[in-house]
Amino acid sequence: MNLVPMVVEQTGRGERAYDIYSRLLKERIIFVTGPIEDEMASLIVAQLVFLEAEDPEKDISMYINSPGGVVTAGLSIYDTMQYIKPNVATLCLGQAASMGSLLLCAGAPGMRCALPNSRVMIHQPSGGFRGQATDIEIHAREILEIKRRLNEIFVRHTGKSLEEIESSMERDNFMIAEKARDFGIIDKVIEKRIEEK
């Protein structure tokens, strides 16, 4: 059972209760928590588009703690992050694995961060299919195409060569926050929030 805390806010019109995630959305903070699948991706995309409509000039923060998930669901979030006008700052807390790591590195340049004890994991896509030989061949070609596209995205956002990305993603590749920074997935490891003046 998931309990979502409520926050009570005093306004000129009395008290207003929000669930914590809705209140944080008001502050332009989106959470990507848990496995990335279609329903969750749809909610994240809707939040990104809503925040763009609210103020296309103001940055959005995306907090990521995800083991990864469905590639097409993750790519719908990725494409929306690239499509909307506001910069999306990404922050890894806990883990950003698989598709979670792709979303982490897709943040705006200079705005991709991780907390010191978080971990990042990159790898090639996996899948399985049963059926007729021709259908298996079609799906094998498709997963190789997905692998190529994901590699190109990591090349674009990390600055690494295609060869470096391919060899680094051959197997599960776990990184502590500092290693993820050195690899180009994030820009900095942060321990404390920097106060804006």
From Swiss-Prot:
Main function: Cleaves peptides in various proteins in a process that requires ATP hydrolysis. Has a chymotrypsin-like activity. Plays a major role in the degradation of misfolded proteins.
Main EC class the enzyme belongs to: hydrolase
Family affiliation: Belongs to the peptidase S14 family.
Enzyme Commission code(s) on record: 3.4.21.92
Subunit structure comment from the entry: Fourteen ClpP subunits assemble into 2 heptameric rings which stack back to back to give a disk-like structure with a central cavity, resembling the structure of eukaryotic proteasomes.
Record key words, sorted: Cytoplasm, Hydrolase, Protease, Serine protease
Organism, scientific name: Anaplasma phagocytophilum (strain HZ)
Active site residues according to the UniProt entry: S98 (nucleophile), H123
Major localization listed first in the record, in broad terms: cytoplasm
Name listed for the protein in its UniProt record: ATP-dependent Clp protease proteolytic subunit
Record's subcellular location: Cytoplasm
Gene Ontology molecular-function annotations: ATP-dependent peptidase activity; ATPase binding; serine-type endopeptidase activity
HAMAP family named in the record: ClpP
GO BP field: protein quality control for misfolded or incompletely synthesized proteins
CDD domains for the chain: S14_ClpP_2
Catalytic activity: Hydrolysis of proteins to small peptides in the presence of ATP and magnesium. alpha-casein is the usual test substrate. In the absence of ATP, only oligopeptides shorter than five residues are hydrolyzed (such as succinyl-Leu-Tyr-|-NHMec, and Leu-Tyr-Leu-|-Tyr-Trp, in which cleavage of the -Tyr-|-Leu- and -Tyr-|-Trp bonds also occurs)
GO cellular component, one term: cytoplasm
Pfam families, sorted: CLP_protease
